[in-house]
Amino acid sequence: MSAWWIAPLVGVLYACAAFLGVQISAAVCRNVQPFEDGPKGGQPPTAWLIGGAAFIGFTLALRGMAPPQLGLAGILTVSLVASWYSDVRVGIVSDYFTLFPLGALVLGSVILHDYGILISAIVVTVPFAVAALFSRGRGMGWGDVKLVALGGAVLGMQAAILAFAAACLIAVAVATIRRRRNEPIPFAPYLAGAIAFALTFSIL
């Protein structure tokens, strides 16, 4: 991928993927009401999501990521943007955005007899699942747990642990600054952002 126009083109395609994620998420959320004890509904930063996706695509192409991996990362972009949008909008992360891509990854790993993806997803997910269980979905929702599993499968165990530890610290810091430590907050944006950052800058 040495042609000068490749990276800008990939950036545009990733922006389109993000736009698709927004539209799909908006359609799924249209008839969904936020839970009373969940995060308050808000307005997702659509323009920033699309612009961020374009930057990620541009950066990945510039770093020489192979076309098949670029395609997979583009599909993941749809999922991450949709998860971010829905959690901010209605406080829920739909299974459509997490379990479908996770299932495809796990199925592929089983077919190839490469169980690293499955093991990474399980190991990384366990502490978040425990948190969701004990908080009864208030501090950590099950949609967040499934997004963590997807991140573990995509990034691998070590990178996912680092990324999600950073996401938790940033979420706590932001909640403290905003004086919302006792209120449920949309956590998917922090998780999705951590996955995107780790994927883009390869903390592997």
List the model feature ranges, each with a label.
Residues 1-204:
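A membrane-topology feature that recognizes alpha-helical transmembrane segments
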